[in-house]
């Protein structure tokens, strides 16, 4: 494959480690791409492309650190996280840092440490990005063959894929180790309203874990989004981490099979399109996970899910009217169905009224009141605890509804509050980003397939607007 270096389009001669800041490799003459095409100019300059990626990582990590410290500086311990517009601290709290029983924040110092560590890391990445973008070798193949590559080199590409898979597997195991050995993680299902605990009894049964993948995505099934205990979540990360690491080793040691060499397009833009497609799928799955799952995304930090807020309202008024003497087991609503309680299509006792459509909700404040046939009437009469009442009243008034002007709550509610749930933000942003990543996947896949067939899709190079503009240099 070493012969491929001479086939590069727009390849130019360079002196290794040339200390100049010349604009070679960045203008249209030497790369075939105009300045606004961004990193396309660096397709065949592995050293410069490394600089762009490292600098980009630095920007990402800088944002994480700065935003983290910003949230710490504005944090008010007396209010729940989801009332304060926080999007990073809920993730740290979910990992068990700084919180105690009921999700109460008892120490903000770990959050401060996290922000500082990210800021320091971003400085290192930023320096590396600037070094490789401006001073380092333009191509890595000659001086550092291990880090060099040619996009057409199928064996090298699958080796790089393998390295990425191993890193992803290590990331999955970091969560496992945090949950098992380093202080545990927050469990919203811990008795009495949630607490941080170490996971001791991992679920490793493939029939249970892979059974989630075979579930229907609808209703009470809910595919993988229906997972509701941490043992399954952490056990799933053991499996995923192992599969990623073993798959990574396999991809490093093997060469692509003949069918894969024939079926796939082997170019930089093709790999970009594959990556965008995968990220798009991740975004859509994350959207559903954030919106519906209150185990991986505890309501104490992210606010209640939509179904949870609705069921909490039914529960709150059941408690109130029961105290006022209503017989909640037999009271009829305006439609002739039960006002407080009714039966689901499969016979369980569920909350009546409009919230009947959310009857498959599972939430830690409600489950203790269920029996073998749904909600247990005797428990509803005798066993409701003050913490359940407080939590449901809180969730009832913090439904994940809201608009861009930050007036949250039901649109017809005149006493709306200045609140938008982080659950809304996370779900919406991941859906929107997933959609745009999918469009990017289609665009780059089309261009890559066209290039492989010998022509080019996109803006006509002979008439693109940039040709009539003054060159940057």
UniProtKB/Swiss-Prot annotation:
<keyword id="KW-0464">Manganese</keyword>
<keyword id="KW-0150">Chloroplast</keyword>
<comment type="subunit">
    <text>PSII is composed of 1 copy each of membrane proteins PsbA, PsbB, PsbC, PsbD, PsbE, PsbF, PsbH, PsbI, PsbJ, PsbK, PsbL, PsbM, PsbT, PsbX, PsbY, PsbZ, Psb30/Ycf12, at least 3 peripheral proteins of the oxygen-evolving complex and a large number of cofactors. It forms dimeric complexes.</text>
</comment>
<feature type="transmembrane region" description="Helical">
    <location>
        <begin position="255"/>
        <end position="275"/>
    </location>
</feature>
<comment type="similarity">
    <text>Belongs to the PsbB/PsbC family. PsbC subfamily.</text>
</comment>
<dbReference type="GO" id="GO:0046872">
    <property type="term" value="F:metal ion binding"/>
</dbReference>
<keyword id="KW-0479">Metal-binding</keyword>
<keyword id="KW-0604">Photosystem II</keyword>
<feature type="transmembrane region" description="Helical">
    <location>
        <begin position="178"/>
        <end position="200"/>
    </location>
</feature>
<dbReference type="Pfam" id="PF00421">
    <property type="entry name" value="PSII"/>
</dbReference>
<keyword id="KW-0472">Membrane</keyword>
<dbReference type="GO" id="GO:0045156">
    <property type="term" value="F:electron transporter, transferring electrons within the cyclic electron transport pathway of photosynthesis activity"/>
</dbReference>
<keyword id="KW-0157">Chromophore</keyword>
<dbReference type="InterPro" id="IPR036001">
    <property type="entry name" value="PS_II_antenna-like_sf"/>
</dbReference>
<keyword id="KW-0812">Transmembrane</keyword>
<dbReference type="GO" id="GO:0009523">
    <property type="term" value="C:photosystem II"/>
</dbReference>
<feature type="transmembrane region" description="Helical">
    <location>
        <begin position="447"/>
        <end position="471"/>
    </location>
</feature>
<keyword id="KW-0934">Plastid</keyword>
<keyword id="KW-0597">Phosphoprotein</keyword>
<feature type="modified residue" description="Phosphothreonine">
    <location>
        <position position="15"/>
    </location>
</feature>
<dbReference type="GO" id="GO:0016168">
    <property type="term" value="F:chlorophyll binding"/>
</dbReference>
<feature type="transmembrane region" description="Helical">
    <location>
        <begin position="134"/>
        <end position="155"/>
    </location>
</feature>
<feature type="propeptide">
    <location>
        <begin position="1"/>
        <end position="14"/>
    </location>
</feature>
<dbReference type="GO" id="GO:0009535">
    <property type="term" value="C:chloroplast thylakoid membrane"/>
</dbReference>
<keyword id="KW-0148">Chlorophyll</keyword>
<dbReference type="InterPro" id="IPR005869">
    <property type="entry name" value="PSII_PsbC"/>
</dbReference>
<feature type="transmembrane region" description="Helical">
    <location>
        <begin position="69"/>
        <end position="93"/>
    </location>
</feature>
<dbReference type="GO" id="GO:0009772">
    <property type="term" value="P:photosynthetic electron transport in photosystem II"/>
</dbReference>
<keyword id="KW-0007">Acetylation</keyword>
<feature type="binding site">
    <location>
        <position position="367"/>
    </location>
    <ligand>
        <name>[CaMn4O5] cluster</name>
    </ligand>
</feature>
<keyword id="KW-0602">Photosynthesis</keyword>
<comment type="function">
    <text>One of the components of the core complex of photosystem II (PSII). It binds chlorophyll and helps catalyze the primary light-induced photochemical processes of PSII. PSII is a light-driven water:plastoquinone oxidoreductase, using light energy to abstract electrons from H(2)O, generating O(2) and a proton gradient subsequently used for ATP formation.</text>
</comment>
<keyword id="KW-0793">Thylakoid</keyword>
<feature type="modified residue" description="N-acetylthreonine">
    <location>
        <position position="15"/>
    </location>
</feature>
<dbReference type="InterPro" id="IPR044900">
    <property type="entry name" value="PSII_PsbC_sf"/>
</dbReference>
<dbReference type="InterPro" id="IPR000932">
    <property type="entry name" value="PS_antenna-like"/>
</dbReference>
<keyword id="KW-1133">Transmembrane helix</keyword>
<protein>
    <recommendedName>
        <fullName>Photosystem II CP43 reaction center protein</fullName>
    </recommendedName>
</protein>
<feature type="transmembrane region" description="Helical">
    <location>
        <begin position="291"/>
        <end position="312"/>
    </location>
</feature>
């Amino acid at each position: 494959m070493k012969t491929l270096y001479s086939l590069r389009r727009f390849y130019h001669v360079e002196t290794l480690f040339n200390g100049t800041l010349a604009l070679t490799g960045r203008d249209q003459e030497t790369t075939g791409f105009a300045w606004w095409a961004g990193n396309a100019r660096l397709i065949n300059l592995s050293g410069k492309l490394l600089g762009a990626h490292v600098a980009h990582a630095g920007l990402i990590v800088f944002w994480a650190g700065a935003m983290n410290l910003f949230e710490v500086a504005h944090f008010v311990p007396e209010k729940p996280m989801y009332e304060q517009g926080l999007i990073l601290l809920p993730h740290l709290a979910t990992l068990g840092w700084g919180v105690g029983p009921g999700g109460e924040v008892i120490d903000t110092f770990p959050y401060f440490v996290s922000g500082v560590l990210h800021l320091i890391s971003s400085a290192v990445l930023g320096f590396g990005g600037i070094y490789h973008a401006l001073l380092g070798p333009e191509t890595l193949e000659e001086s550092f063959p291990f880090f060099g590559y040619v996009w057409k080199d199928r064996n090298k590409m699958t080796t790089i894929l393998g390295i990425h898979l191993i890193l992803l597997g290590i990331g999955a195991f970091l969560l496992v180790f945090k949950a098992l050995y380093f202080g545990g993680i927050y469990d919203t299902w811990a008795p009495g309203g949630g607490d941080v605990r170490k996971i001791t009894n991992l679920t490793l049964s493939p029939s249970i874990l892979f059974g989630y993948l075979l579930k229907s995505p609808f209703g009470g099934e809910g595919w993988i989004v229906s997972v509701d205990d941490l043992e399954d979540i952490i056990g799933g990360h053991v499996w995923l981490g192992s599969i990623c690491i073993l798959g990574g080793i396999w991809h490093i040691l093997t060469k692509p099979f003949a069918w894969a060499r024939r079926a796939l397009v082997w170019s930089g833009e093709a790999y970009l399109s594959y990556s965008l497609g995968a990220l798009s799928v991740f975004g859509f799955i994350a959207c559903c996970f954030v919106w519906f799952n209150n185990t991986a995304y505890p309501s104490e930090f992210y606010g209640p899910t939509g179904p949870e807020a609705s069921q909490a309202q039914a529960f709150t008024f059941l408690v109130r009217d029961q105290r006022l003497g209503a017989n909640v087991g037999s009271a009829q609503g305006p439609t002739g169905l039960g006002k407080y309680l009714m039966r689901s299509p499969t016979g369980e006792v569920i909350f009546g009224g409009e919230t009947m459509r959310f009857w498959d909700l599972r939430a830690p404040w409600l489950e203790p009141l269920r029996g073998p046939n749904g909600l247990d009437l005797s428990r509803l009469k005798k066993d409701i605890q003050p913490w359940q009442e407080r939590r449901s009243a809180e969730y009832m008034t913090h439904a994940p509804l809201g608009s861009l002007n930050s007036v949250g709550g039901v649109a017809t509610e005149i006493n709306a509050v200045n609140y938008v749930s982080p659950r809304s933000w996370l779900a919406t942003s991941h859906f929107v980003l997933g959609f745009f990543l999918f469009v990017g996947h289609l665009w780059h896949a089309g261009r890559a397939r066209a290039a492989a067939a010998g022509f080019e899709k996109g803006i006509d190079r002979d008439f693109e607007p940039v040709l009539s503009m003054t060159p940057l240099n």
